[in-house]
């Protein structure tokens, strides 16, 4: 029996839902990259001085890690990428794992449902972490990856300790208040 003139029903999700998911992912990636600070500001050599002491170094590290968080993440990923160029299998496996992390953990708004069961974020985090460790062990590039991550961490900590943080503003309101108070202050006699 045929149904002429009937509107066909589709068994796959509509393209509008797919486009919505892609645009939401694009928005999250853009908002994450929007926190990136200018590289010129990060590597301003006039702002590089040795800290006065241990607590000054700790204070600088905390401030700079918060301020340059996206820049440091890009730098760490770049160092990791460079270290995996000589291990193409590991690079492919790591790329697949990054896609899993992005879509199953970072870009997911609603809870993950598998076979009708709702899985919480902690379970997804543990599962992805175990999968990542197992895959890194299977590719025999674990020492290379750990070495590159250790190198990147040391470089980030050195930069964060040496980069002065007194001229950084975590939000635009603080910058405006400081500029206004600087313009309105009068020298005391």
UniProtKB/Swiss-Prot annotation:
Bilayer disposition of the protein: Multi-pass membrane protein
Keywords: Endosome, Membrane, Transmembrane, Transmembrane helix, Transport, Vacuole
Presence of keyword Transmembrane: yes
Cellular localisation: Endosome membrane; Vacuole membrane
A GO CC annotation given for this chain: vacuolar membrane
Keyword ATP-binding among UniProt keywords: no
Coiled-coil boundaries: none
Superkingdom classification of source: Eukaryota
Tissue and organ expression note: Expressed in hypocotyls and trichomes.
Transmembrane domains' residue ranges: 65-85, 87-107, 123-143, 145-162
Effect of a null allele: No visible phenotype.
InterPro entries tied to this protein: Prenylated_rab_accept_PRA1 (IPR004895)
Biological process according to GO: vesicle-mediated transport
Pfam families tied to this protein: PRA1
Function: May be involved in both secretory and endocytic intracellular trafficking in the endosomal/prevacuolar compartments.
Family the UniProt entry places it in: Belongs to the PRA1 family.
UniProt subunit comment: Interacts with PRA1F1, PRA1F3 and PRA1D. Interacts with ACD11 and BPA1.
Stated name of the protein: PRA1 family protein F2
Organism: Arabidopsis thaliana
């Amino acid at each position: 029996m045929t149904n002429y003139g009937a509107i066909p029903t589709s068994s796959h999700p509509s393209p509008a839902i797919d486009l919505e998911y892609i645009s939401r992912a694009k928005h999250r990636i853009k908002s994450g990259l929007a926190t990136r600070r200018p590289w010129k500001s990060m590597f301003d050599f006039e702002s590089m001085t040795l800290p006065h002491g241990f607590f000054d170094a700790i204070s600088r590290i905390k401030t700079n890690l918060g301020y340059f968080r996206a820049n440091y993440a890009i730098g760490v990923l770049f160092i990791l990428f460079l270290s995996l160029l000589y291990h193409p299998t590991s690079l492919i496996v790591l790329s697949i794992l990054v896609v899993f992390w992005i879509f199953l953990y970072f870009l997911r708004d609603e809870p993950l449902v598998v076979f009708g069961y709702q899985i919480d974020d902690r379970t997804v985090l543990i599962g992805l972490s175990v999968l990542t460790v197992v895959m890194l062990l299977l590719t025999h590039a674990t020492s290379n990856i750990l070495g590159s991550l250790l190198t990147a961490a040391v470089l980030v900590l050195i930069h964060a300790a040496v980069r002065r943080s007194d001229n950084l503003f975590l939000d635009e309101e603080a910058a405006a208040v400081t500029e206004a108070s600087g313009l309105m202050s009068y020298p005391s006699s």
